[in-house]
Each structure stands twice: as C-alpha cells, then as structure tokens.
C-alpha cells in the first residue's frame, strides 16, 4: 500500500477503505508518511468530502493512535459533554455536578482556552490548589469514588489528531467538516465515554458561523456516534452574543457558583438545565426532555448539585472555601464601566469582539503557552432585545491597569449596536440532532 495511491483515490472522489485510512493514520503518526503527503490528502478531503463510514473509520483510527481509557467497569453509563467553544461558556462547571448529582457518572477531559474561546480547565484553576493534571489511575479512581471528575488532557489522547490539526492550521484545511468531526470525536472516543452530549455553537462567537454548517457538523458527529456504538446527541445553540454575563476565568467561576446556588442569568440557566436533561436522557436516567429538565432543576433546588461540585473541588485538592465565599476568588484591581451613548433596543452584542477583548486584557491566550490572568474579564450587562437608556452600563471591564482597558474600549463600545425599533431576542437553541 502506498500513500500516493490513497491520495490519488481521494483526489478522484473515490471512497477509501478502512484499511487505507488506518494505513494513512498509523504511518503519519509514526512519521513514515511525510507532512506534504498528508497535507495533499487533507486538501483532497476538504474539496471532495467523505462518507459517514469513511469519517467513522478515520475517527476510530485516530482514537487508536494513542492512549485509550477503559471505563467499562461503569457498565456503559459514563456520559461526557463537549462544546465546540464559545464566549462566556462556563456550562460544564454547572452541568457536570447537576448530572452527577442525579446519579450519572460524569468523566470529562477538558481543554484550555485558545483564541477567544475560553477553556474549562482555566476556569477551574482560578480555584487555589485545584489539580487538573490527573493520571489515568487517578481519573478512574475519582470517577469511581465521587461519580465526577474534570481533568485536563494530560493523557496522550489521539496524537494523530494533534499532528493533523497542526498541519490543517497551516494548509487551509481547518474548515473541512469531516476533519473537524473526526478531530472532536476521536478524542471523545479515546477518553472512554459511552454517551456524548455535543453543544455545537452557532454564530459570531463560534467556530461555526452559520446554521447550515453547524447542522452538517452536528449530523456527521451523531452519525459517527451511531456507527461507533456510542449514544450521541448534538444541540445547536446560539453564540452570536456571549452566554450569561461573565467572560473571564474567575468571573465565570463566580457565575457558575451563583447558578449552583439557584441564581444567575436566564440564558445560562436555560442552557444548563437543557444540556443536563439531554445528558440524563443519554444516560437513561430520564425518559424525555421534560422529565430530564425536572430532575436537573431539582438537583439545583435541593442543593445536591452544589454539594457535588464541592465534592469535585475537594477531591481534586481545590480550596472549597471559595465556593462558600466567591469573593475569595482572584479579583481585578479596577472595574471600569462602558456606557451607552443613546437609548433604544439592543440589536447586536458581538460575541467575537467581546471574546477578543477578553484575550487582549489577559483573560485568554493569543497563542499556546501564553500566561493568563485569572482575575481579569468582562461583565456583559445587556442582551439582544433589551430596552436601554442613554448612559446605561453596557460592560463592566475588570482589569489590573487602565492601559489594558484603553486597548479594548473602542472594540467593546462598537460591539453593541442599538436600534430605534424594538428587537426580538434570538432563541437560545436552534435545534437538536440525534434524539
């Protein structure tokens, strides 16, 4: 078998066999196949696409290229969640303890933030002492003991995907749906979950800008789930404006703690309850969306989700006192408001501009390895559809020096557009696939 023949086959729009895909992935991972050949193949995939079976074979080959977690002792019950990334998306911090409090084990490996999309692990590390780099043995023992574990991707999961992603980044092949879907699902399958809830974000602050592309990606990932024997649901959710109010690590942690205490922004509340419900359906704890929502809300109302969150933080050596006293979390020295020049109805709150501004003030990374400031961030005080007055606060910017504020002032000011006519708020969700 030769790599060049496989490239020609895909160039000519033919379907690749399981053996051909395995050959490519295995030999690319070991360095036998050079970057330039895989780059040519990736471009052929971008231009000509892949069948669902091909994408599944690619996913499984990439999952098998490194460590694979065996969670079979949990009897097919472990459920995982993945978000394609957004601005202010602190959902995992609330959803994981809700679902675990309902008796369903949640074992999740999360990433760090890159670009304007925040990472769950960065938010958890705003809690002093929290240990996010667990070994396989620690991951499984904590899941066994507490029914919940959230860790960084310290294992060598799907190394073929890491190598391929680095190439896609510099060869114009990032936007290929088969390659995006196999990238996400290979890591999820390698991390051992039986059921996966996918939160596919759509809009200005998301990787997928339009509903058509997001829908296609969701359908492909659900198909991979079916063909690989996993239960998968994909929820399409709105990301034109940030989720909730807080953007920035300690600020988002504070908002998640508020939600677990029964308060918090409406859009974030709906998002957490619905995603929890879908996870409970996947884990066969709830028969339908309504009963799943009821179970999730009860876990918030009776305090069991908050208790489970404390258990998680304690089990991973974090300082639990910050959950009782969120004011102990890192805080910025300055809080500077940005106000509206005119009255009217909020037409746009540009999630990308808010996310990029948060990176510029130090809350996120422009490139891998950048050091982040846990304390800084942005509180978004308006939502699309709100009626506002001139002089009303649009944002509270949390910074440690005024210069940082000045670099983002104009971008944030223009990220909100105000209409003279009433504006209809957007739906929280655009649909669900796989249910």
Feature locations, PLM:
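A glycine-rich helix N-cap at a beta->alpha junction
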Residues: 123-149, 219-225, 229
């Amino acid at each position: 078998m030769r790599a060049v023949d496989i490239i020609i086959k895909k160039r000519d729009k033919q379907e690749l066999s399981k053996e051909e895909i395995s050959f490519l992935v295995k030999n690319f991972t070991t360095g036998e196949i050079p970057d330039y050949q895989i780059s040519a193949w990736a471009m052929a995939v971008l231009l000509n696409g892949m069948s669902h079976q091909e994408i599944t074979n690619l996913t499984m080959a990439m999952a098998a290229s490194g460590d694979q977690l065996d969670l079979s002792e949990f009897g097919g019950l472990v459920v995982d969640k993945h978000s394609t990334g957004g601005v202010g998306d602190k959902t995992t911090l609330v959803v994981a303890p809700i679902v675990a409090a309902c008796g369903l084990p949640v074992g999740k490996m999360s990433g760090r933030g890159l670009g304007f999309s925040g990472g769950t692990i960065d938010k958890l590390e705003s809690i002093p002492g929290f240990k996010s780099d667990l070994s396989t043995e620690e991951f499984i023992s904590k899941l066994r003991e507490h029914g919940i574990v959230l860790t960084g991707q310290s294992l060598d999961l799907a190394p073929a995907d890491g190598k391929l992603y680095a190439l896609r980044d510099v060869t114009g092949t990032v936007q290929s749906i088969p390659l995006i879907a196999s990238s996400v699902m290979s890591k999820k399958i390698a991390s051992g979950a039986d059921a996966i809830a996918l939160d596919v974000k759509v809009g200005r602050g998301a990787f997928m800008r339009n509903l058509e592309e997001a829908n296609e990606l969701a359908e492909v990932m659900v198909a991979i789930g079916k063909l690989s024997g996993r239960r998968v649901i994909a929820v399409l959710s709105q990301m034109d404006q940030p989720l909730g109010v807080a953007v920035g690590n300690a600020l988002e942690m504070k908002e998640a703690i508020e939600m677990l205490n029964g308060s918090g922004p409406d859009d974030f509340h709906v998002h957490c309850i619905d995603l929890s419900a879908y996870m409970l359906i996947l884990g066969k704890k709830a028969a339908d969306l309504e009963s799943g929502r009821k179970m999730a809300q009860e876990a918030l109302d009776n305090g069991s989700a908050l208790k489970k969150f404390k258990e998680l933080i304690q089990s991973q050596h974090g300082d639990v006192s910050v959950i009782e006293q969120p004011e102990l979390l890192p805080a910025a020295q300055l809080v500077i408001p940005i106000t509206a020049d005119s009255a009217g109805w909020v037409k746009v709150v540009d999630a990308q501009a808010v996310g990029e501004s948060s990176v510029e003030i130090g809350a996120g990374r422009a490139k891998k390895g950048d050091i982040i400031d846990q304390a800084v961030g942005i509180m978004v005080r308006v939502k699309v559809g709100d009626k506002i007055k001139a002089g009303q606060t649009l944002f509270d910017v949390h910074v440690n020096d005024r210069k940082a504020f000045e670099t983002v002032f104009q971008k944030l000011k223009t990220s909100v557009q105000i209409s003279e006519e009433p504006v209809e708020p957007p739906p929280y969700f655009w649909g669900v696939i796989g249910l």
